[in-house]
Amino acid sequence: MKDLLNLLKNQGQVEEFDAIRIGLASPEMIRSWSFGEVKKPETINYRTFKPERDGLFCAKIFGPVKDYECLCGKYKRLKHRGVICEKCGVEVALAKVRRERMAHIELASPVAHIWFLKSLPSRIGLLMDMTLRDIERVLYFESYVVIDPGMTTLEKGQLLNDEQYFEALEEFGDDFDARMGAEAVRELLHAIDLEHEIGRLREEIPQTNSETKIKKLSKRLKLMEAFQGSGNLPEWMVLTVLPVLPPDLRPLVPLDGGRFATSDLNDLYRRVINRNNRLKRLLDLSAPDIIVRNEKRMLQEAVDALLDNGRRGRAITGSNKRPLKSLADMIKGKQGRFRQNLLGKRVDYSGRSVITVGPTLRLHQCGLPKKMALELFKPFIFGKLEMRGLATTIKAAKKMVERELPEVWDVLAEVIREHPVLLNRAPTLHRLGIQAFEPVLIEGKAIQLHPLVCAAYNADFDGDQMAVHVPLTLEAQLEARALMMSTNNILSPANGEPIIVPSQDVVLGLYYMTREAINAKGEGRVFADLQEVDRVFRAGEAALHAKIKVRINETVNDRDGNSVNNTRIVDTTVGRALLFQVVPKGLSFDVVNLPMKKKAISKLINQCYRVVGLKETVIFADQLMYTGFAYSTISGVSIGVNDFVIPDEKARIIGAATDEVKEIESQYASGLVTQGEKYNKVIDLWSKANDEVSKAMMANLSKEKVIDRHGDEVEQESFNSMYMMADSGARGSAAQIRQLAGMRGLMAKPDGSIIETPITANFREGLSVLQYFISTHGARKGLADTALKTANSGYLTRRLVDVAQDLVVTEIDCGTEHGLLMTPHIEGGDVVEPLGERVLGRVIARDVFKPGTEDVIVPAGTLVDEKWVEFIELNSIDEVIVRSPISCETRYGICAKCYGRDLARGHQVNIGEAVGVIAAQSIGEPGTQLTMRTFHIGGAASRTSAADSVQVKNGGTVRLHNLKHVERVDGNLVAVSRSGELAIADDFGRERERYKLPYGAVISVKEGDKVDAGAIVAKWDPHTHPIVTEMKGTVTYVGMEEGITIKRQTDELTGMTNIEVLDAKDRPAAGKDIRPAVKMVDDNGKDLLLPGTDVIAQYFLPANALVGVADGAKIAIGDVIARIPQETSKTRDITGGLPRVADLFEARRPKEASILAEVSGTIAFGKETKGKRRLVITPNDGSDPYEELIPKWRHLNVFEGEQVNRGEVISDGPSDPHDILRLLGVSALAKYIVNEIQDVYRLQGVKINDKHIETILRQMLRKVEISESGDSSFIKGDQMELTHVLVENERLNAEDKFVSKFTRVLLGITKASLSTESFISAASFQETTRVLTEAAVTGKRDYLRGLKENVVVGRLIPAGTGLAYHSERKRRRDADKPLRVSASEVEAALTEALNSSGN
């Protein structure tokens, strides 16, 4: 009976827990874990292979080596369980207790724990307020530290070297206590009175003025409060007892040949035990101090190496000269405990094989080789065979399966029916890398994959392998079928567009069947219905491309969603009529009445999904594929060398270019142009020539002449095989055809610069040796790039997933009214992304009014779908405030309204959706497509001439946005602000284009004017920066003395004289401090004031300014007083591609970032200091002026006396996101980062929805910095979680106390991941040691809210179906609280019941 009870006891349910706390272990605690002390360094006996007693593998301490058998063999078998053998002292138990039981080593002298000593910032150092260097000198026995000064002049914590110590001894005798080593440190830590220290620090902080000191004090204060709050004692950072890991976690395995393979930990432990025992002996013998000291130091080093080898000094190496793997190395890195065993586990019931095409499969099927299926579904087959009575035992069933009897195959077919399997292709970059399919048994050994899912897997059939996994439990099968089935994943989660889109052969076939040809057989016939067309085509009476008329019946949905039948006669071709047969009801014939290129097919599937739903779309996609394959086979499209038609104009174009290049070469030789100009001109020339050749070639390829049925010669689109492939989007592009039939063009060197001599040949003509050599140069770089890119992109994805992993949709609506203002994304005047596309799938945050009225046309809280988008565009709305993940106020997670539509499903997102991970995958997955290189704006890569005017593309009405301007005498406006924009709106009031207007631009239209397309509405000189007057008057020169501050220059060509202001460093001593200016006076010579201010109207002239007005001249409003020549923009590398995305997400400050105005006010320049200008902004509200020093070489956009607004650009350069956040707020930052990241992806043609980037941004903006602590417990300058601060402020508000004030902080993704609330998540990401050290000292609790923490502790994740499980568990536990019974009570009750039943 007792055995039964014990069994029950052992089977006890794992304790349910809500949080995991990490802390420091006290010596008592370490002893309480221990099952005995390890006293000897021996491991096992080399003859008997039995563990030595009291050694590192001792069976008495750790438990038996064999199940239920003591070491000497006296007690064997289960009946003796729990007996302790009197001979060998081993308890009879399961051998697996050797994985759980720990031991300890009593250290003869205390030892500092290296993590708390060396992991920066040193915790021991902070607490004791000593530098790490000093503490190390004490610990490693180089100097003494005063512990108790007694009545002497020494101070507590003072360091003494040997000499000073002996002097002090002579002077004071035994009045003071100074020691060295870890015991001294332990004494000092023990003596710290936390409460007293905390009080002292809290008083001290407000009284100090120096920033650095405040920082240091608040760091100490934080640490002390952490110790006080967590119940850890400071002296526990010094070890007096060392725990020993269970032996089966550091195994010793005999190899053949009498050698052993051992874990490095055993060596490290042996070293510690040896030194510890030697030290004990020396202390017993009371050996000389110097020997003991040396031994103590060696013990300290041995323990250091065991805990974290290599952290201090040289790493201890084993016999093979490799550093030994210490405890810290066991848990960190890719091979460490976290990433290898806790986050990534191996999967049972899986197989892998090569994939081949399965063109006959349905979308939800995959072909599974019989051999594989038999192995994967073995347990199910055994069960079925037994159930059927075909086999009596499992053993018999096994035999049947091994012999592969015919009934086994029948049973297999039955088992497999409707049992989905998961197919996965590595690398799994997004969630579509694992999908579920129903298996179909096939012969052969390769898995068959449906061609349409290849895009999602990024798979091709050149030898790719895929893995198959079997979902075993009913729940797993259910989830696989309902959520992961390939038919449920038609849309891409990244952008909401179909990802099940035909490509290659299928596209070619569909394109071929929907093309029209002139004068094909059967042209002009009229058919009664589609069936008739089909019959005539099969009979060979009409060609596939013939133009015909057909009467069709279509069912279309009208605006209200009701289906309407429609009969009409349409002009079409035979192929299109045939294709319409597979189109589902509800779509109009117009969707197929055009040549089906790849984009058109994608649109068709998208429309099908939105109009007729999922099921029809899946059937339709399959039908499209079958049709496409059939007709691409019939088409017989193939390429021969004669398809590459070389244009006749090629030779002429190349000849002309060569002549021009010769001309430039001769100019260079005679010194008329510089090397750089020559290079740029030549490259420009060749790129132009290349474009001309390719234009001629495409014109040649794309058209062919045919005879129509009237006998005339007409042109039609070509049926050239290569042209059809490129035009349909099946394979190849114009650029590739250009290399085959045009000219290869300019080649790049590995550093991105372009080689001057182009390759004039194409692949049809063949390359010469030199040409081939030139082209290999850049091609190798491409391959090397790809390898690097994959690794970098993977690392970016990992950081993104880590920062966003705990973001899950946790509620329907957080009730916020905030959001982001959405406007169309306009670049260089073009609308790149219309408003409709940007708000699709978002929830409107505030009512949208009809322009110019008070009528609400879109109420707040509307989820914008395709119909609403049409409606918004019809009503010409050009800005909408939408809910956004950034402004969501849900505390943990995010609400469904702020996220909007689940892109992969097309409806509002469900609670439990792991939107953070989806966002990270959507951004990271296309990472490999981005380029690695930084673009040189040089050569032909991407050179644009500087813009000098605005020419409108569409006619419409002019709108001017935040433009300050003055009106000139001739009626034109002159811009006097920097951020002005000019927009053109159409008749509906929709903005079609938008242009930036620089300072000094002359605008020839006014607000509300009508302009025609092509009109030039503004002009400026791109190479100079004007200074414009805002009033009329007479010019007076101030401080402009020739030869001292200015020099006169006469232009040789025009004979005009200019006055140029000299740079301060070129002036004679007399002119160094004079600041030349132009002052405006009225006719009586009185100073004029700037309009609306009491500032004298004088314009200070910067160095090199050219003054164009004479002293005493009369000028009018808007005239230019002076021009500052602008250096032509230096060719700086623009970081593009992947590195740019990484920089933005890491929130790195760019080099030479643009300088923004910190406050709104008036600009003035103060006294210059060495090499810097002093910029002073006087705020308009009369507060203190703001000063900033700016290096002289920075080009400033502002002049003395000018008004700027907070956040306006003062000096150009790349923007610093931190500045944008600080000065312009969260929404400006969101707009900037979203646009910048989208620009990189758009360049590669990748579509990602904005909300994914916003989701990551939300995680980067989690933290705030406390600027005033109010009555809260926060310290000024602390970084806290935003939600934490808001909750605390709510509490303070309720108690009528002062709340804390804070500013938002932007963290890069790596930093944000490391500073999450969960230490498990942070530790498993990077810098494991540092994270765990900090968490242990502060006694952190991890509430397991994210996904990663739950995976690590082995639970379901709180997302998707797991979220329901977690909330249900919580609900049950809350209901059960009072009913909790302790285990001992249950045991007592059971025992009593059993005893009373008479045993």
Curated annotation (Swiss-Prot):
This is DNA-directed RNA polymerase subunit beta'. SMART domains: RPOLA_N. It holds the Pfam family RNA_pol_Rpb1_2. Coiled coil: none annotated. PANTHER family: DNA-DIRECTED RNA POLYMERASE, DNA-DIRECTED RNA POLYMERASE SUBUNIT BETA. Belongs to the RNA polymerase beta' chain family. GO terms for molecular function: DNA binding; DNA-directed RNA polymerase activity; magnesium ion binding; zinc ion binding. Binds 1 Mg(2+) ion per subunit. Binds 2 Zn(2+) ions per subunit. Its EC number is 2.7.7.6. It catalyses: RNA(n) + a ribonucleoside 5'-triphosphate = RNA(n+1) + diphosphate. DNA-dependent RNA polymerase catalyzes the transcription of DNA into RNA using the four ribonucleoside triphosphates as substrates. The RNAP catalytic core consists of 2 alpha, 1 beta, 1 beta' and 1 omega subunit. When a sigma factor is associated with the core the holoenzyme is formed, which can initiate transcription. Keywords: DNA-directed RNA polymerase, Magnesium, Metal-binding, Nucleotidyltransferase, Transcription, Transferase, Zinc.
